[in-house]
UniProtKB/Swiss-Prot annotation:
Keywords: Glycoprotein, Heme, Iron, Metal-binding, Monooxygenase, Oxidoreductase, Signal. SUPFAM superfamilies: Cytochrome P450 (SSF48264). This is Cytochrome P450 ARB_01131. The keyword Protein biosynthesis does not apply. It is an enzyme of class 1 (oxidoreductase). It comes from Arthroderma benhamiae (strain ATCC MYA-4681 / CBS 112371). Belongs to the cytochrome P450 family.
């Protein structure tokens, strides 16, 4: 009797699901036909469920060359293709027209590929004044943090700059969030365990990156190590959030300068006093501000020491424009912005090593992409509700049909005389459309100023002699989380100039 009752309850539900799925499939087919959509190419997987691609991804990740797999798959499957992995269908693309559609045109307004709608827009408006009204204070903090970095270089002159760059951007991003220098944050008990936090933050990102590649089966990865890392990160930020909440609860007199200063956490506290919301917002900003800029600095110095001709040309520009040596003046904001060759160098670094090399959006309703369907890839293609579209900026920035036969090479001169002014969405160092990075001007200033000060202070900057010789560009070990950092560090030999 019980089994009969269960059958009577379950069978109608199964029938309902099947009918609903069938009707949805018919609606999708009709929608696709009305838009002229055709099926995209399939990816190169040979095993059921794409398991061979998963095995290959694990192998490449162990070698710390996962982005090389992306390049190979684009070469094998084309600029836009369909992937089927573990029962989930998705689209991958490195086609600028498709990425533009995802980020700015038909996928905006109605909420396509955005998960947080009005909340995201409101958070963005809260952050905008930090970069619009605090330019001078932000620049002063960059100067302060760069001086700390320079003083951290050991007397031997042989140093891995990558962790120092992460420390630098950690300082400046904490300032953006909380409005204090790192020493004053320490005195308030907010910091003091930066290394522990950094290790946990990095470990958490490693797990998130691997879980993301498993799609709906992300829960297979986790465990105590991941939970402990999350707790360390949460505790670190929660301490600062509690300080801000207590600060906002006390009535006190403030100076005119303090009234004019915009502090992100203070503005956020005026909107919500929910600690978990405040923590999540701060962690988002910390990731965007610390990791992306630190990685850009790391790749910039690696590429400069690997290309002495470019480094020499950049030194000449700094010497002629600002001056070199211990008696040279610190560059101003306007001077950094006027260094045209430095701008070309940073552009080229961000082309080869974009801050966020892989990204994706999930469709909240059935829609289309403008190209990638049909045998020649010129027809529109269907993207069903819930399906993800991944786009690999790292691979797109290496397309030879966009950047020429030497697209894999580091050549800042390719940007001279606006030679690539029409590249459009083929160049996305800071995303695009409504979600373009608010902090890009600050990040470029931070990178540019740091590079100039290093060149002014150290008369020689060369590749350090290590046991393992440096790999060719693009074949080095990389660590891919939400950003791409160097798996080999940034080992250099530096010698300070004399008066």
């Amino acid at each position: 009797m019980l089994s009969l009752i269960v059958a009577c309850l379950v069978l109608p539900l199964i029938c309902y699901k099947l009918v609903r799925s069938y009707n949805q499939s018919r609606e999708d087919e009709q929608f696709a036909a009305s838009k002229g959509c055709q099926p995209p190419r399939k990816w190169s997987a040979k095993w059921p469920l794409g398991l061979d691609m998963l095995v290959k991804a694990v192998r490449y990740e162990k070698r710390q060359q996962i982005l090389q797999l992306f390049l190979e798959e684009v070469a094998a499957s084309g600029s836009t293709f369909e992937q089927n992995l573990l029962f989930a269908r998705g689209i991958d693309t490195v086609e600028p027209r498709n990425i533009e559609a995802i980020l700015s045109t038909q996928f905006t307004g109605s909420g396509i590929f955005t998960q947080d709608g009005p909340q995201w827009k409101h958070s963005r408006e809260l952050l905008r004044p930090q970069f619009m009204t605090n330019r001078f204070r932000n620049f002063e903090q960059i100067r302060h943090a760069v001086n700390n970095l320079i003083s951290s270089v050991p007397d031997s002159g042989v140093v891995d700059l990558q962790p120092l760059f992460f420390r630098l951007t950690f300082e400046t991003t904490l300032f953006l969030l909380f409005g204090h220098y790192l020493p004053s944050l320490k005195s308030e008990g907010i910091t003091g365990h930066e290394s522990q936090f950094a290790n946990a933050f990095n470990l958490g990102q490693d797990y998130l990156a691997q879980r993301g590649r498993l799609g709906d089966l992300y829960w297979l990865l986790g465990g105590r190590e991941f939970k402990d890392a999350c707790k360390v990160c949460h505790d670190f930020i929660d301490n600062a959030v509690q300080k801000a909440l207590k600060h906002s609860s006390r009535e006190k007199k403030v100076s005119d300068e303090e009234k004019e200063t915009y502090v992100f956490i203070d503005a956020l506290v005026q909107e919500t006093r929910e600690p978990s919301v405040l923590r999540d917002q701060c962690l988002n900003i910390l990731l965007a501000g610390r990791d992306t800029t630190a990685c850009c600095l790391t790749w910039t110095l690696r590429l400069l020491v690997q290309h002495p001709d470019v480094l020499s040309k950049l030194r000449d520009e700094v010497r002629d424009t600002i001056g070199m040596g211990p008696d040279a003046p610190d560059p101003t904001i306007s001077q950094v912005k006027k260094l045209s060759y430095l701008s070309l160098v940073i552009k080229e670094v961000l082309r080869l090593y974009p801050s966020v090399p892989v990204n994706s959006r999930a469709a909240v309703k059935t829609t289309t992409l403008p190209t990638g369907g049909g045998p020649d890839g010129s027809a529109p293609l269907l993207v069903r509700r819930g399906e993800a579209v991944g786009y690999c900026v790292y691979a797109m920035h290496r397309r030879k049909d966009i950047y020429g036969p030497d697209a894999d090479c580091f050549r800042p001169e390719r940007w001279e005389n606006d030679a690539l002014k029409d590249v459009g969405y083929g160049y996305l160092p800071f995303n695009g459309g409504p979600r373009i990075c608010l902090g890009q001007e600050f990040a470029l200033l931070e990178v540019g100023y740091t590079v100039v000060r290093l060149l002014q202070t150290f008369e020689t900057i060369e590749e350090a002699e290590t046991k393992v010789p440096g790999a060719p560009l693009g074949e080095e070990k990389q660590t891919l989380t939400l950003v791409v950092s160097s798996g080999e560090g940034c080992w250099v030999s530096m010698k300070k100039g004399t008066k």
